[in-house]
Amino acid sequence: MTGYDLVVAARRVVAGGAIAPARVGVRDGVIRAVVPWEHELLGTETVTLPDEAVLLPGLVDTHVHVNEPGRTEWEGFATATAAAAAGGVTTVVDMPLNSVPPTVDPAALEVKREAAAGQVYVDVGFWGGAVPGNTGRLRALHAAGVVGVKCFLLDSGVPEFPPLDPAQLRAALTELSTVDGLLIAHCEDAAAIGPAPPGRDYRGFLASRPPQAETRAVAGLIAAASETGVRVHVVHVSAAEVLPLLRAAVADGVRITAETCPHYLTLAAEDVPAGATQFKCCPPVRDAVNRDALWAGLADGTLSCVVSDHSPCTPELKRFDTGDFAAAWGGISSLQLSLPVVWTAAVARGRSLVDIALWMAQRPAELVGLRSKGSIAPGFDADLVAFAPDQEFTVDPHALRHRNPVSPYAGRTLRGVVRDTWLRGERVGDAPRGRLLRRGD
């Protein structure tokens, strides 16, 4: 067939749960054909990847804190989406907090969309927020196109986004049940968390946020979801003790899924140097035995996807001057590095790029109902990544595209380099041409 705007040919294409030689035909920004290598497709432009490169679907990162408007010294739409594109991420979904105003009603969503317009290099969707007092606005947020709503079950760290108590959580879920909405939750129980001792020793901070903080909060979420029938999702699982609770809930018919993040799959508490607050996040990075259990949970499907939880701040807020884990902001910036970070660890564990595409593209897109994202298949957006899985590089934070050069991966040698990124059939370049998405796009 003729008439394709773009044909991308590769000896290794990740599509349909397999890796095979193929040609991908694109017209009007949409994949129209995926055919075996020996079949010719004629296009206005034809790109043949070198043998060392693999064609992946563009990744979908559903856990990104862009922080604009209001805290653009931390991050912003231009820098975050440029970092995403450089890392093979073609769709991000922005979290409702750390921006001012937080995205807790349709008016705030419109403010955020206006802030993003014209400066995004990849496609961007939005989460709404559930906070005390906005239950009556959740259906309007849903109608305005958010992919779901997020709540905290303990203090979020910013005063404009307070947590829900158990009664407020049930009220929010009851409201969402009328539109079959999705609620995602930061699951830590404040009653199980002690004050972090001041100082440079990571072990003190880790001990202040034990696994029980996660398990208690997840148990409460499961109970509320079971009562209301609403679909819920646990963000950034760090404690392996959560996994049996998730398995039991799914067996009982609760509509629950969960994610983990690159740092929980690749870092270990025993390796965190004294005062290295770039490793601080909440919930915390735990030990290597726990890390192995998270990989097992990912392999058996208990954890459905891997997303970055890109949560940047200024270097000053990381308190590098003192290295005080108690005082430093908790958050890890890894949007540009998620793919090579996870791939480096995954290949060492015998996993394949089929797994990467499932965990980091297909399932995140399915989670948030972005039906045209996450797969190389006819009818999907032509969001494509040329990835050299065997090429290595050393992380230089100053070479990354996000705003502040802070990374726990500084100096690490990682495997896998993004050679090229296409958004809806066009190479991502110097001009921002991303779209602002609504649920269902």
What would you call each of these model-derived segments?
Residues 1-57:
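Histidine-rich, glycine-flanked metal-binding segment
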Residues 53-119:
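Metal-associated gating/positioning segment near the N- to mid-region
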Residues 69, 95-121, 126-135, 140, ...:
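Active-site loop-to-helix "anion-binding N-cap" substructures in soluble metabolic enzymes
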Residues 106-122, 169-185, 337:
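Alpha-helix-loop-beta-strand connector modules within alpha/beta enzyme cores
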Residues 136-151, 157-306:
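Histidine/acidic residue-rich metal-binding segments in metalloenzymes
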Residues 203-208, 212-231, 304-306, 312-390:
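His/Asp/Glu-enriched, well-ordered alpha-helical/loop segment
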